[in-house]
């Protein structure tokens, strides 16, 4: 088990500022629409130990096509509100010798191997306290670059805590690093990353979680479609980073499902709930 430092907001800010510096270094262009749906700017005192938005907590549901999606969502919220989001992260990441201490110091919520009930309860409590919990509801990278089936945890947490779900669709960050395509400085140089923030989704405690989750999936995919429509980079024929249905080289949905099933439940995103 790696060293587990105490939660430290200064460490979180160092991580975010490092990310901002890397964006400036590579001159990455982040293009955002729907910012009016984000929480209002932070109104706490600048030296307050708690960085929370002024309107209460929310679940931030993020699409997952590449390994840097979480980072761009984090930078988006930080730039707009100075909110420090807490992510649900796997036990594997928490146990990693390098990532583990960072997960602990940043105050993220760890989902254990056997059961996620403790993490779920901890996340709901943080939401009630005004924190922003970020979730990748697809529970794994979608190699078809279409939003795949989502777990119900995001909407269930939001309903139990009485907070909205904010859908965040990210397109283009998968070009920088994703499955079978490692980081390339050449691709990152002046790369565009497109983000669309959907309207907050309010889920009542009596609503069907599966139906609400499927609606959330549709909202996230609509955001992706909007991002693709005005993405400032023309893909070549059969570009690997484009969906098959748009002439790209990514696997079709059927091929993606077969590949996920072949890898087993853990690599494919685990047991659906």
Q: What is each model feature region?
A:
Residues 1-36, 96-106:
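A transmembrane-helix-recognition feature enriched in membrane-embedded lipid enzymes
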Residues 12, 19-64:
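Helix-to-loop junction immediately C-terminal to a conserved catalytic motif
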Residues 44-115:
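Catalytic core of membrane glycerolipid acyltransferases/transacylases, capturing the structured
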Residues 121-129, 191-221, 225:
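A charged, well-structured terminal subsegment
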């Amino acid at each position: 088990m790696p060293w587990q430092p105490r939660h430290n907001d200064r460490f979180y800010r160092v991580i975010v500022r490092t990310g901002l510096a890397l964006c400036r270094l590579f001159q990455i262009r982040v293009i955002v629409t729907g910012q009016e749906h984000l929480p209002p700017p932070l109104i706490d005192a600048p030296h307050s130990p708690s960085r929370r938005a002024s309107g209460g907590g929310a679940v931030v549901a993020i699409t997952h096509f590449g390994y840097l999606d979480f980072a761009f969502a984090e930078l988006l919220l930080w730039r707009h509100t100075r909110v420090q989001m807490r992510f649900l992260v796997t036990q594997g990441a928490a146990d990693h010798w390098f990532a583990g201490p960072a997960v602990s110091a940043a105050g993220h919520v760890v989902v254990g191997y056997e059961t996620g009930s403790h993490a779920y309860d901890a996340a709901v409590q943080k939401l009630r306290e005004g924190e922003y919990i970020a979730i990748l509801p697809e529970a794994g990278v979608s190699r078809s670059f279409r939003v795949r089936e989502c777990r119900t945890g995001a909407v269930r947490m939001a309903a139990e805590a009485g907070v909205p779900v904010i859908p965040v669709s990210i397109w283009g960050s998968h070009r920088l690093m994703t499955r079978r395509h490692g980081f390339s400085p050449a691709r990152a140089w002046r790369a565009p990353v497109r983000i669309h923030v959907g309207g907050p989704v309010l889920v009542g405690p009596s609503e069907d979680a599966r139906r609400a989750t499927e609606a959330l999936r549709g909202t996230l995919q609509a955001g992706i479609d909007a991002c693709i429509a005005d993405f400032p980079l023309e893909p070549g024929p059969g570009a690997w980073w484009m969906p098959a249905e748009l002439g790209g080289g990514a696997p079709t949905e059927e091929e993606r499902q077969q590949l996920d099933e072949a890898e087993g439940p853990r690599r494919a995103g685990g047991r659906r709930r």
